Regions:
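Alpha-helical repeat scaffolds
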Residues: 16-27, 85-87, 152-155, 213-215, ...
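Aromatic- and histidine-enriched alpha-helix N-cap/loop-to-helix transition segments
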Residues: 1-2, 56-70, 126-134, 190-195, ...
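Extended ligand-binding clefts on enzyme/binding-domain cores
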Residues: 93-100, 116, 122-238
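Extended ligand-binding groove/face enriched in aromatic
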Residues: 2-127, 133, 172-175
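Boundary/linker segments of alpha-helical solenoid repeat arrays
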Residues: 12-19, 166-172, 227, 268-276
Length: 462
């Protein structure tokens, strides 16, 4: 495991005096043209940090360790296994190696955040609220799983930086939102309110009130809530996908319906692959595969119910780790359409779909594990009692099935855990602007860019 940019982009960018004007207009402070590194150049080795060989242990590189912990936490939540609690190696500068665990990473990140109230930086000199909000999600889920309290740094950071990172007029209306902040020169690089969508999506499970404020302001600026205004396709659909996901999460049915209809027409959703068993959004790019990040964001509005994204982090289903579970499915020859426990009926419901015509109707097996009492087991297949199963241990059974479409109802006697995850606190805020707004000074340097000229941000307007 390693971070290529951190290992190779040493010192200032040698090409920073050659950036094209279009790029300068978007990303470089006006008073430092030719003397300032573009976003994306990490500049490992510059002062005051010096060369830091460890991508995780470094003061910067937040976009590596923050996202890494988020992915690791999601992996643990999915599998129920503390995989990253064991030591893993991280590649460093000059072929050095560093041993880390997820738990040490979280302690390090939380400590860094506590010491730097403006937030740890990504590239040297640049703090990104977008990345910090994703890093906060990782801490939030980590705390829920391991019953820790590292996430407290996030709401404290939001309140501490709100009046510096965001621009409000005298009435409290949002005028601009942050892209990055450079603490060495006290410079905010900002865009209009619609840029807030990128932060709102990751902020909503952590600070739903301010996240919704960012979302509503962006929607109004873009005109998505105006049924008389046409929604137009832009070159970059990322923010429209984020808007759709946010609309669903916040229960904004007007915007959700409008953006969903737009996505159906312009995102090119279609099935593909053998027997059309795969699905993706192709965005009319005429490419071999769907774009990964774009398609994944677009799918956020297709899975789960309204509020599911926030509940994943604020009220995760930890009881599932002790619930009866389906294992041993011959994927991808058999697809799992449904597998869930109903604690009220003490029943595990399973729907399987055959996906390989060559193996159609031939025999195979599945396993059900973590059954509390084998003496109470009853199995139904397609609505009828089914006895082609046997115990394989004190809490597991093996069921004979075939490569065909099957519905199983398995009475297990499991009625739910007595205690679920306790991480269910709601951050309540009555005002969008901190009462201490006169304490945090405004930045000495501010540049508000016109994102309508950016090829990757044109869907955002100003």
């Amino acid at each position: 495991m390693g971070c290529y940019d951190w290992l190779t982009q040493i010192g200032p960018d040698p090409n920073r005096d050659k950036y094209p004007q279009e790029w300068i207009d978007l990303w470089i402070p006006d008073h430092l043209v030719g003397k300032y590194d573009t976003p994306g150049w990490v500049a490992n080795g510059i002062e005051p940090w010096g060369l830091q060989k460890d991508p995780i242990g470094a003061d910067g590189n937040l976009f590596f360790k923050g996202w890494l912990n988020l992915i690791q936490s999601l992996h643990v939540y999915t599998t129920g296994e503390d995989t990253w609690g064991s030591s893993f190696q991280v590649a460093g500068v000059d072929r050095s190696k560093f041993d880390w665990t997820q738990h040490r990473l979280v302690e390090h990140l939380s400590s860094q955040w506590t010491k730097n109230r403006m937030g740890p930086h990504c590239e040297n000199t640049k703090i990104w609220p977008y990345c910090l909000s994703a890093a906060g999600l990782g801490l939030q889920l980590y705390d829920a799983i391991f019953q820790k309290n590292t996430h407290s740094v996030y709401p404290e950071w939001v309140e501490h930086t709100k009046d510096k990172y965001y621009g409000f007029d005298s009435s409290g209306a949002l005028e601009w939102t942050p892209i990055y902040y450079d603490p060495l020169i006290d410079h905010i690089h900002a865009a209009g309110p619609s840029n807030g969508l990128t932060i709102a999506f990751y902020m909503m499970p952590q600070d739903p009130v301010f996240a919704e404020f960012l979302y509503r302001t962006a929607v109004k600026k873009l005109g998505w809530d105006n049924i008389n205004k046409e929604i137009k396709m832009k070159p970059e659909p990322r923010f429209m996908a984020l808007g759709l996901a946010c609309a669903k999460e916040f229960g904004d049915t007007t915007v959700e319906m409008r953006l969903r209809a737009f996505a159906e027409e312009h995102f090119e959703p279609r099935w593909f692959g053998e027997n059309n068993k795969n699905f993706g959004y192709w965005f009319n790019l005429n490419e071999k595969w769907p774009r990964g990040q774009w398609a994944a964001l677009a799918m956020m509005a297709e899975v789960g119910k309204s509020g599911a994204w926030s509940n994943l982090f604020r009220n995760p289903n930890l009881e599932k780790f002790n619930a009866p579970s389906l294992e041993g499915v011959d994927f991808p020859n058999i697809l799992v359409n449904q597998a869930f426990n109903d604690p009220n009926r003490q029943t595990l419901y399973i729907k399987l779909k055959a996906a390989n015509k060559i193996k159609e109707n031939s025999p195979t097996k599945i396993f059900i594990k973590k059954i509390p009492d084998l003496s109470s087991i009853k199995v139904k297949r397609d609505g009828y009692l089914y006895d082609m199963w046997r115990a394989t241990g004190k809490s597991s059974i093996e069921i004979d099935i075939s490569y065909s479409d099957i519905e199983l109802e398995i009475y297990t006697g499991w009625s739910g855990a007595k205690k679920r995850g306790e991480f269910n606190k709601v951050i309540k805020k009555d005002n969008f602007i901190s009462e201490s707004s006169n304490i945090m000074q405004r930045p000495r340097s501010l540049k508000i860019i016109n994102t309508s000229t950016c090829p990757c941000c044109t869907s955002m307007g100003n």
